[in-house]
């Protein structure tokens, strides 16, 4: 059985792809691991709505009881948002989830992989994974970075999560040959913070230019790209405010011996507490804005087929 045959592409998504319509993939770890109920469901639905309003088709991806699924329906989003014991699946975990009949939420890496297999060229997320800070674990490097180096999908995001070592993350992306494009910015966003202080490879200010860069990159045999736009200014945190909250969260994680896949969700939970929930509102808003931009990019790509 080939990979495509193992994926259930829902009829609305399959029809859109067949007709050359713009489709945007959405990851699902945000729903199961990134945000609490009911903010997780509200955010997922708002992201899909933002894509539809731009004239594109949303395709949330997950593993449902062992079935690789592209294009979750609203009742399934609801079930995933309330479910417990949901596996957090990167690309390496997909076979385990399928073989064991598990329900799993897909990370950026797994979503990219499945989106590409389905024929989708653009995905949206809050932020990509990256290299953790040395104070956490210098060897903890997200599979997202390596997936970007081998899978031709454009990932629209607000940079890398602020809890990461962003300079090192950008160095790895450069080494892997992954273009990092700033949308409306010359500095790489840091998820909760509008700027990390690190320069991007280039700045663009329109979906048209983004589409041209994507197509040229793919024509040259390139794989993934990062299109990073800052979080909405009215919701973003100040860098000093964030760093103070993060220092406390990292201290608590070290004291509790929290590491591995559990570290990022733990730190995000502590940050939500330390900022009195401000990061939850910000997370929702930036995901929706990224979904909107991804839809515009997908439309430009579709018009150039």
Where are these regions (language model features)?
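Solvent-exposed alpha-helices and their adjacent loops that cap or buttress functional pockets
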Residues: 15-18, 23-24, 53, 113-117, ...
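Glycine-rich nucleotide/cofactor/substrate-binding loop typically near the N-terminus or early
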Residues: 28, 33-35, 41-96, 219-233
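A glycine- and small-aliphatic-rich helix-loop capping segment at beta-alpha/alpha-beta transitions
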Residues: 38-44, 76-81, 130-149, 172
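Active-site glycine-rich loop that binds ribose-phosphate moieties when present
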Residues: 105-107, 136-149, 153-174, 206-212
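Anionic-ligand binding region
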Residues: 192-218
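A C-terminal functional module that forms or caps the active site or interfaces directly
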Residues: 221-289
